[in-house]
């Protein structure tokens, strides 16, 4: 039988952790001065007015490089718990992790051959 009262501490923590940011934003909205005018709507960068246009178009190579970085960053997140419990999990999990890394290496070789890792 599922007893809900076993999770009272969890639900209390969840409610308090949700209410604190809501209350902080609500109180700051009540106490903050309201200023309207052209200065409120002006754009600035690091405290000064921007020079030239604010919109820049990035080359697609930056996006590809960032995408490859995110893929291998997520790989690290998945492999870290596996490495910490390597001695407990056994051979089958080692084979699964090896297949996972192999798939990512194939993706890395593909990205390398397509030129996604080159800056020129």
UniProtKB/Swiss-Prot annotation:
Annotated catalysed reactions: a plastoquinone + NADH + (n+1) H(+)(in) = a plastoquinol + NAD(+) + n H(+)(out); a plastoquinone + NADPH + (n+1) H(+)(in) = a plastoquinol + NADP(+) + n H(+)(out)
Keyword Signal: no
Entry keyword set: Chloroplast, Membrane, NAD, NADP, Plastid, Plastoquinone, Quinone, Thylakoid, Translocase, Transmembrane, Transmembrane helix, Transport
GO cellular component annotations of the record: chloroplast thylakoid membrane; NADH dehydrogenase complex
Its membrane topology: Multi-pass membrane protein
Main localization (coarse): plastid
BP GO terms, sorted: photosynthesis, light reaction
Quaternary structure note: NDH is composed of at least 16 different subunits, 5 of which are encoded in the nucleus.
Family: Belongs to the complex I subunit 3 family.
HAMAP family with a match to the protein in the record: NDH1_NuoA
Protein name per the record: NAD(P)H-quinone oxidoreductase subunit 3, chloroplastic
Native organism: Sorghum bicolor
